[in-house]
Amino acid sequence: MVEYLVSLGADVRSNYDHAIKSAFENGHLQVIKYLISLGSDVSMHYDYILLRASRNGYIDVVKYLIEQGVDPRTNNDKAVRKASKNGRLEIVEYLVTLGADIRIDNDSAVRWASKNGHIKTVEFLVAKGADIRAKNDYSLRHSSKHGHIKMVEYLVAQGADVRADNDYAIKWASGKGHLEVVKYLVEKGADFRADNDCAVKWASQTGRVEIVEYLVSKGAVCPY
């Protein structure tokens, strides 16, 4: 299609090289190479494009950009952090081979991956030295908040503290309606009555009937 449009006289560089930018955004490497052969040039935007390609999982584009001289560690290793956040394990692994620092920004790579439930990515990062307890057990607290039970179980097995930050995990899991997570946290010693029965209050306020019933059965006092 692109070749056809070019044959009709389309200007591949119109609108500030929008065509090639779009090709990068969508991971169309062959189109990218074709447009470059016709004179398209977005080299001044390569760093930004690397971040987008890493986030979106376009490993071929990431490799191509690095072959063109883009620094894989640009912007404080933002590429590996973006890839981790979105569970792009293949890209994370590749960037690590190029020297990416997975622990930069207070272990934001493993924190974001945990929050979003990307367990394979988290396992890889931990194997490479990431601290799952960084920032007051952010990984466990936010994976609990978002209901990622397998992630929660994994993090606890790795030594995460279910009671961190005044039992943040069970309070947020309760308020968000994640019953399986709530039960698991209670089993592992979370204080479901912390902060003046905050967990059952939040569950009640957000209409999480099953969680309210469960917590009350355990001894929580619901004031409503």
Swiss-Prot record:
Keyword Disulfide bond (UniProt): no
Coiled-coil regions listed: none
ANK repeats: 1-14, 15-44, 46-74, 75-104, 105-134, 136-164, 165-194, 196-224
Keywords: ANK repeat, Repeat
UniProt-listed InterPro entries: Ankyrin_rpt, Ankyrin_rpt-contain_sf
Pfam families: Ank_2
Keyword Repressor in annotation: no
Origin superkingdom: Viruses
The protein's name in its UniProt record: Putative ankyrin repeat protein R845
Organism: Acanthamoeba polyphaga mimivirus (APMV)
